[in-house]
Curated annotation (Swiss-Prot):
PANTHER family: TRANSLATION INITIATION FACTOR IF-1, CHLOROPLASTIC. InterPro entries: NA-bd_OB-fold, RNA-binding_domain_S1_IF1, S1_domain, TIF_IF1. It is found in: Cytoplasm. The keyword RNA-binding applies. The gene is infA. Keywords: Cytoplasm, Initiation factor, Protein biosynthesis, RNA-binding, rRNA-binding. This is Translation initiation factor IF-1. The keyword Protein biosynthesis applies. Residues 1-73 form the S1-like domain. One of its GO terms (cellular component) is cytosol. Its main location: cytoplasm. It holds the Pfam family eIF-1a. Belongs to the IF-1 family. It comes from Kineococcus radiotolerans (strain ATCC BAA-149 / DSM 14245 / SRS30216). HAMAP family: IF_1 (MF_00075).
Length: 73
């Protein structure tokens, strides 16, 4: 699957789970962002818990919000 143009992918750790499938994620560079689960992860019932290592996609237009696209095993 080709990568999307213009998105920034960065690793992080889930700090806390919030209502409505939102999560607070601390990125590897120390910043904290608000992230939601991607549609494919919802479809396949992939569960995210605090302390999980994840990959977050950030839009260059709003670096304070992101989408969780992968959870490390």
């Amino acid at each position: 699957m080709p990568k999307k143009d213009g998105v920034i992918e960065i690793e992080g750790t889930v700090i806390e789970a919030l209502p409505n499938a939102m999560f607070r994620v601390e990125l590897s560079n120390g910043h904290k962002v608000l992230a939601h689960i991607s549609g494919k992860m919802r479809q396949h019932y992939i569960r995210i818990l605090p302390e999980d290592r994840v990959v977050v996609e950030l839009s260059p237009y709003d670096l304070s919000r992101g989408r969780i696209v992968y959870r490390y095993k």
